[in-house]
Amino acid sequence: MGHKHERPVEPFSDLHVEHGHVRATLLHDPTVEGLDMAIYMDGSASMSGDYAYKKKYNNLIDWFFGRNEVNLPNNVEPQVQWILEYLATKDRNGLLRVAYWACGASGKDIELVGELKGTDVQSYKFPGPNFQGKSTNLAPALKDYVNYLRKQMHLGARRGCAVFVTDGEIHDEDDVKRYCNEIAKEMQKGSLPKINFILVGVGEGVNEEQMEEICHEEYPGIGHLWCHRIAEEINEVAELVAVLVDESMTVAGGGRIVDDKGKVLKLYESRLPAVLEFQIPEGA
Protein backbone atom coordinates (compact mmCIF):
# COMPACT_ATOMS: atom_id res chain seq x y z
CA MET A 1 0.00 0.00 0.00
CA GLY A 2 1.57 3.34 -1.05
CA HIS A 3 0.81 6.86 0.07
CA LYS A 4 -2.85 7.70 -0.16
CA HIS A 5 -4.74 10.82 0.83
CA GLU A 6 -8.28 9.74 1.56
CA ARG A 7 -11.33 11.97 1.37
CA PRO A 8 -12.04 12.56 5.07
CA VAL A 9 -15.56 12.26 6.43
CA GLU A 10 -16.85 13.46 9.78
CA PRO A 11 -15.47 13.15 12.48
CA PHE A 12 -12.18 13.52 10.55
CA SER A 13 -10.81 16.63 8.87
CA ASP A 14 -7.74 14.99 7.34
CA LEU A 15 -6.68 11.41 6.64
CA HIS A 16 -3.39 9.99 5.33
CA VAL A 17 -2.61 6.31 4.80
CA GLU A 18 0.90 5.10 3.95
CA HIS A 19 2.04 1.46 4.04
CA GLY A 20 -0.60 0.59 6.62
CA HIS A 21 0.20 3.58 8.82
CA VAL A 22 -2.77 5.89 9.35
CA ARG A 23 -2.56 9.51 10.45
CA ALA A 24 -6.05 10.84 11.09
CA THR A 25 -6.88 14.37 12.23
CA LEU A 26 -10.16 14.73 14.07
CA LEU A 27 -12.46 17.60 13.18
CA HIS A 28 -11.40 20.20 15.73
CA ASP A 29 -11.63 23.99 15.79
CA PRO A 30 -8.18 24.95 17.08
CA THR A 31 -6.99 28.01 18.95
CA VAL A 32 -3.33 28.76 18.26
CA GLU A 33 -1.62 31.51 20.26
CA GLY A 34 0.18 34.19 18.26
CA LEU A 35 -1.04 32.93 14.87
CA ASP A 36 -0.57 35.31 11.93
CA MET A 37 -2.57 34.39 8.82
CA ALA A 38 -2.80 35.54 5.22
CA ILE A 39 -4.82 34.85 2.06
CA TYR A 40 -3.30 34.95 -1.42
CA MET A 41 -5.52 34.70 -4.51
CA ASP A 42 -4.23 33.30 -7.81
CA GLY A 43 -3.92 36.21 -10.25
CA SER A 44 -2.86 34.23 -13.32
CA ALA A 45 -4.69 34.30 -16.64
CA SER A 46 -5.98 30.74 -16.12
CA MET A 47 -8.19 32.19 -13.36
CA SER A 48 -9.70 34.98 -15.48
CA GLY A 49 -13.02 33.18 -15.93
CA ASP A 50 -13.31 32.64 -12.18
CA TYR A 51 -13.02 36.39 -11.52
CA ALA A 52 -15.62 37.30 -14.17
CA TYR A 53 -18.87 38.75 -12.84
CA LYS A 54 -21.95 37.32 -14.53
CA LYS A 55 -25.14 39.30 -15.06
CA LYS A 56 -28.66 38.14 -14.32
CA TYR A 57 -31.88 39.48 -15.88
CA ASN A 58 -35.47 38.98 -14.79
CA ASN A 59 -36.69 38.19 -18.29
CA LEU A 60 -35.77 38.17 -21.98
CA ILE A 61 -36.98 41.75 -22.53
CA ASP A 62 -34.69 43.06 -19.77
CA TRP A 63 -31.81 41.10 -21.30
CA PHE A 64 -32.51 42.49 -24.77
CA PHE A 65 -32.55 46.11 -23.59
CA GLY A 66 -29.80 45.58 -21.01
CA ARG A 67 -31.89 46.87 -18.12
CA ASN A 68 -32.57 45.77 -14.53
CA GLU A 69 -29.41 43.71 -14.56
CA VAL A 70 -28.06 42.17 -11.37
CA ASN A 71 -24.34 41.43 -10.97
CA LEU A 72 -23.73 37.98 -9.48
CA PRO A 73 -20.61 37.18 -7.43
CA ASN A 74 -17.71 35.62 -9.31
CA ASN A 75 -16.42 32.15 -8.40
CA VAL A 76 -13.65 33.43 -6.12
CA GLU A 77 -15.36 36.19 -4.13
CA PRO A 78 -17.80 34.19 -1.94
CA GLN A 79 -15.13 31.60 -1.15
CA VAL A 80 -12.57 34.20 -0.08
CA GLN A 81 -15.21 36.08 1.92
CA TRP A 82 -16.10 33.14 4.16
CA ILE A 83 -12.47 32.02 4.44
CA LEU A 84 -11.48 35.53 5.52
CA GLU A 85 -14.34 35.75 8.01
CA TYR A 86 -13.36 32.44 9.62
CA LEU A 87 -9.59 32.86 9.58
CA ALA A 88 -9.86 36.30 11.18
CA THR A 89 -11.17 34.53 14.30
CA LYS A 90 -7.90 32.56 14.39
CA ASP A 91 -5.52 35.43 13.66
CA ARG A 92 -3.76 37.08 16.61
CA ASN A 93 -5.11 40.57 15.82
CA GLY A 94 -8.02 39.77 13.49
CA LEU A 95 -6.26 41.31 10.47
CA LEU A 96 -5.20 39.20 7.49
CA ARG A 97 -2.74 40.11 4.78
CA VAL A 98 -4.69 39.70 1.52
CA ALA A 99 -3.03 39.79 -1.89
CA TYR A 100 -3.09 38.45 -5.44
CA TRP A 101 -0.18 36.25 -6.52
CA ALA A 102 1.07 35.12 -9.96
CA CYS A 103 0.51 38.60 -11.41
CA GLY A 104 2.28 40.55 -14.15
CA ALA A 105 4.04 39.45 -17.33
CA SER A 106 6.36 37.11 -15.42
CA GLY A 107 3.62 35.60 -13.26
CA LYS A 108 5.85 36.36 -10.27
CA ASP A 109 4.43 39.69 -9.08
CA ILE A 110 2.33 40.27 -5.96
CA GLU A 111 -0.54 42.79 -5.90
CA LEU A 112 -1.34 43.66 -2.30
CA VAL A 113 -5.02 44.24 -1.47
CA GLY A 114 -4.29 45.19 2.15
CA GLU A 115 -4.78 43.97 5.71
CA LEU A 116 -8.46 43.15 6.01
CA LYS A 117 -10.72 42.50 8.98
CA GLY A 118 -13.09 39.54 9.13
CA THR A 119 -16.11 41.77 9.75
CA ASP A 120 -18.49 42.96 7.01
CA VAL A 121 -16.82 40.58 4.57
CA GLN A 122 -19.75 40.85 2.15
CA SER A 123 -18.61 44.40 1.38
CA TYR A 124 -15.24 43.17 0.07
CA LYS A 125 -14.96 42.73 -3.69
CA PHE A 126 -12.32 40.56 -5.30
CA PRO A 127 -12.47 41.23 -9.05
CA GLY A 128 -8.99 39.90 -9.78
CA PRO A 129 -5.63 41.65 -10.17
CA ASN A 130 -4.87 44.69 -12.31
CA PHE A 131 -2.31 42.71 -14.31
CA GLN A 132 -2.95 39.00 -14.77
CA GLY A 133 0.04 36.71 -14.84
CA LYS A 134 1.04 34.85 -17.97
CA SER A 135 2.30 31.98 -15.83
CA THR A 136 1.49 30.73 -12.34
CA ASN A 137 4.46 30.98 -9.98
CA LEU A 138 3.79 30.16 -6.34
CA ALA A 139 7.30 30.48 -4.85
CA PRO A 140 7.31 34.33 -4.96
CA ALA A 141 4.06 34.34 -2.95
CA LEU A 142 5.64 32.09 -0.33
CA LYS A 143 8.61 34.46 -0.10
CA ASP A 144 6.26 37.43 0.24
CA TYR A 145 4.47 35.78 3.13
CA VAL A 146 7.66 34.70 4.90
CA ASN A 147 9.09 38.23 4.61
CA TYR A 148 5.84 39.58 6.03
CA LEU A 149 5.92 37.05 8.87
CA ARG A 150 9.50 37.99 9.80
CA LYS A 151 8.31 41.55 10.43
CA GLN A 152 5.28 40.35 12.38
CA MET A 153 7.50 38.24 14.65
CA HIS A 154 8.75 41.49 16.22
CA LEU A 155 5.11 42.39 16.93
CA GLY A 156 4.11 39.14 18.61
CA ALA A 157 3.59 36.57 15.84
CA ARG A 158 4.57 33.10 17.07
CA ARG A 159 3.16 30.93 14.29
CA GLY A 160 2.29 31.43 10.63
CA CYS A 161 -0.25 30.06 8.18
CA ALA A 162 -1.05 31.25 4.67
CA VAL A 163 -3.90 30.17 2.39
CA PHE A 164 -3.37 30.16 -1.38
CA VAL A 165 -6.54 30.17 -3.48
CA THR A 166 -5.90 28.66 -6.93
CA ASP A 167 -7.16 26.50 -9.76
CA GLY A 168 -4.20 24.21 -9.10
CA GLU A 169 -2.26 25.01 -12.28
CA ILE A 170 1.17 25.79 -10.80
CA HIS A 171 4.25 26.16 -13.03
CA ASP A 172 7.11 26.34 -10.51
CA GLU A 173 6.52 23.24 -8.41
CA ASP A 174 10.27 22.49 -8.12
CA ASP A 175 11.01 26.04 -6.93
CA VAL A 176 8.21 25.72 -4.38
CA LYS A 177 9.70 22.53 -2.96
CA ARG A 178 13.22 24.02 -2.87
CA TYR A 179 12.03 27.11 -1.01
CA CYS A 180 9.96 25.00 1.38
CA ASN A 181 13.16 23.10 2.20
CA GLU A 182 14.77 26.42 3.15
CA ILE A 183 11.75 27.29 5.30
CA ALA A 184 11.93 23.91 7.05
CA LYS A 185 15.63 24.40 7.84
CA GLU A 186 14.94 27.84 9.33
CA MET A 187 12.10 26.41 11.38
CA GLN A 188 14.45 23.77 12.78
CA LYS A 189 17.05 26.42 13.63
CA GLY A 190 14.41 28.56 15.32
CA SER A 191 14.88 31.57 13.05
CA LEU A 192 11.32 31.07 11.79
CA PRO A 193 8.30 29.92 13.81
CA LYS A 194 6.24 26.93 12.76
CA ILE A 195 4.57 27.70 9.42
CA ASN A 196 1.91 25.87 7.44
CA PHE A 197 0.45 26.47 4.00
CA ILE A 198 -2.99 25.60 2.63
CA LEU A 199 -3.91 25.29 -1.05
CA VAL A 200 -7.61 25.90 -1.69
CA GLY A 201 -8.92 24.90 -5.11
CA VAL A 202 -11.73 26.99 -6.60
CA GLY A 203 -13.64 27.09 -9.86
CA GLU A 204 -14.20 24.48 -12.51
CA GLY A 205 -11.51 22.03 -13.53
CA VAL A 206 -9.28 22.32 -10.45
CA ASN A 207 -5.99 20.46 -10.97
CA GLU A 208 -6.12 18.56 -7.68
CA GLU A 209 -3.42 16.12 -8.76
CA GLN A 210 -0.79 18.86 -8.84
CA MET A 211 -2.02 20.25 -5.53
CA GLU A 212 -1.53 16.79 -4.01
CA GLU A 213 2.02 16.59 -5.42
CA ILE A 214 2.95 19.72 -3.48
CA CYS A 215 1.09 18.77 -0.31
CA HIS A 216 2.45 15.22 -0.03
CA GLU A 217 6.06 16.42 0.15
CA GLU A 218 7.68 15.80 3.54
CA TYR A 219 10.55 17.92 4.84
CA PRO A 220 13.31 16.53 7.12
CA GLY A 221 12.60 17.15 10.79
CA ILE A 222 9.31 18.90 10.02
CA GLY A 223 7.07 16.55 8.03
CA HIS A 224 4.27 18.06 5.98
CA LEU A 225 4.09 21.84 5.54
CA TRP A 226 1.06 21.78 3.25
CA CYS A 227 -2.50 20.55 3.04
CA HIS A 228 -5.08 21.15 0.34
CA ARG A 229 -8.84 21.53 0.12
CA ILE A 230 -11.44 21.96 -2.63
CA ALA A 231 -13.55 24.95 -1.56
CA GLU A 232 -16.84 23.56 -2.82
CA GLU A 233 -16.31 20.32 -0.86
CA ILE A 234 -15.74 21.92 2.55
CA ASN A 235 -18.71 21.12 4.79
CA GLU A 236 -17.31 22.30 8.13
CA VAL A 237 -15.19 25.45 8.33
CA ALA A 238 -12.76 23.71 10.72
CA GLU A 239 -11.78 21.39 7.83
CA LEU A 240 -9.89 24.33 6.35
CA VAL A 241 -7.40 24.55 9.22
CA ALA A 242 -6.79 20.85 9.88
CA VAL A 243 -3.10 21.55 9.27
CA LEU A 244 -3.04 23.64 12.48
CA VAL A 245 -4.29 20.76 14.62
CA ASP A 246 -1.60 18.73 16.40
CA GLU A 247 -1.13 15.92 18.91
CA SER A 248 -1.01 18.29 21.88
CA MET A 249 -4.70 19.18 21.45
CA THR A 250 -7.26 17.06 23.31
CA VAL A 251 -10.78 16.37 22.04
CA ALA A 252 -12.04 13.83 24.62
CA GLY A 253 -11.14 12.03 27.84
CA GLY A 254 -10.30 8.78 26.09
CA GLY A 255 -11.34 6.39 23.36
CA ARG A 256 -10.39 3.46 21.20
CA ILE A 257 -9.96 2.66 17.53
CA VAL A 258 -11.45 -0.56 16.17
CA ASP A 259 -11.39 -2.06 12.69
CA ASP A 260 -14.35 -3.41 10.74
CA LYS A 261 -14.05 -6.75 12.56
CA GLY A 262 -14.20 -5.15 16.00
CA LYS A 263 -10.50 -5.64 16.75
CA VAL A 264 -9.01 -2.86 18.90
CA LEU A 265 -6.18 -1.21 16.96
CA LYS A 266 -5.32 1.42 19.54
CA LEU A 267 -6.54 2.37 23.00
CA TYR A 268 -6.43 5.86 24.47
CA GLU A 269 -7.07 5.63 28.21
CA SER A 270 -6.52 9.11 29.65
CA ARG A 271 -7.02 11.46 26.69
CA LEU A 272 -7.99 11.35 23.04
CA PRO A 273 -5.62 13.58 21.05
CA ALA A 274 -6.83 15.52 18.01
CA VAL A 275 -4.35 13.64 15.81
CA LEU A 276 -4.47 9.83 15.84
CA GLU A 277 -1.69 7.59 14.51
CA PHE A 278 -2.03 3.83 14.29
CA GLN A 279 -1.29 0.79 12.14
CA ILE A 280 -4.05 -0.95 10.22
CA PRO A 281 -3.58 -4.60 9.20
CA GLU A 282 -3.80 -5.67 5.57
CA GLY A 283 -7.38 -6.38 4.55
CA ALA A 284 -8.96 -4.39 7.38
PLM features: what roles do these ranges have?
Residues L26, A252-A284:
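N-terminal accessory interaction module
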Residues L27-T31, Y86-K90, N147-R158, K185-S191:
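Surface-exposed acidic, glycine-flexible loop patches that form ligand/cofactor-binding
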Residues N68-V80, N130-K143, D172-V176:
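Phosphate/oxyanion-binding active-site loops and adjacent basic polyanion-contact surfaces
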Residues E169-G221, W226-C227:
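VWA/integrin I-like adhesion module and closely mimicked acidic/polar interface patches used
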Residues R92-P127, E209-I214:
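Short beta-strand-loop
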Residues M1-E69, R150:
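Acidic, polar low-complexity linker/tail segments
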Residues E208-Q210, H216-V264:
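C-terminal helix of von Willebrand factor
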Residues T119-R159, I170, G203-Q210:
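Von Willebrand factor
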